A protein has these predicted regions:
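Short alpha-helical segment of the dimerization/phosphotransfer core of two-component systems
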Residues: 6-11
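Conserved micro-motifs of the catalytic ATP-binding
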Residues: 26-31, 70-73
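Conserved catalytic submotifs in the C-terminal HATPase_c
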Residues: 32-35, 59-69
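Short helix-loop "hinge" at the ATP-lid/N-box region of the Bergerat-fold HATPase_c
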Residues: 89-90
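Short beta-strand/loop element within the Bergerat-fold HATPase_c
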Residues: 96-105
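Short conserved segment of the HATPase_c
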Residues: 115-128
Length: 174
């Protein structure tokens, strides 16, 4: 029964991501951007994933230069970006999640699992999954949705690897 519940949850997540991605590609999802408090949507996303974070022993570390950090974004899209990045860290990371922020930038970083490194050139491509990631589920849409939402809000997203950590940086329009 637990296996069936998990598979149904995975299928629901896949359908939700496909629907969102299709709406984004078709221009059917208007985003109303403005000066948005960066932390409240992050707290909501972290609370949503609290059981998974706790089970993974991945208590997030937050490093923001101030609590009232604001970015140019749609609050709903920003929340979705956060949720996708947290889900990605849980699914593909080796523990430890750090989120840092300063004027116009927010960076998520997490430890990598042992094995082959993700291909940074294709990390944000639709349906991209590194070889080991295929065994951990997902459709390969989460990070492409992050890129699409960031670009629709006038921002950018980039990724890199430093030592044994993957970092994903969100740069918001000023």
């Amino acid at each position: 029964l637990d296996t069936i519940k998990k598979r149904l949850g995975d299928l629901e997540e896949l359908l939700e991501e496909l629907f969102l991605y299709t709406r984004l590609q078709g221009g059917a999802l208007p985003l109303e951007c403005g000066k948005t408090a960066a932390l409240p949507p992050l707290w909501e996303a972290l609370a949503e994933f609290y059981p998974q974070l706790e089970a993974a022993g991945a208590a997030p570390e937050l490093r923001f230069d101030r609590e009232n950090l604001a970015v140019w974004a749609s609050p709903e899209a920003l929340g979705r970006v956060y949720r996708n990045l947290i889900a990605n860290a849980l699914r593909h990371g080796g523990g430890g999640l750090t989120v840092s922020g300063r004027d116009g930038e927010i960076c998520f970083s997490n430890e990598l699992l042992p094995g082959p490194r993700p291909d940074l050139e294709h990390l944000f491509d639709r349906f991209y999954q590194s070889s080991p990631a295929r065994a951990r589920g997902g459709a390969g849409l989460g990070l492409s949705i992050v890129r699409e939402l960031m670009e629709r809000m006038g921002g950018q997203v980039s990724a890199g690897i430093a030592e044994n950590e993957l970092w994903i940086k969100l740069v918001f329009a000023q």
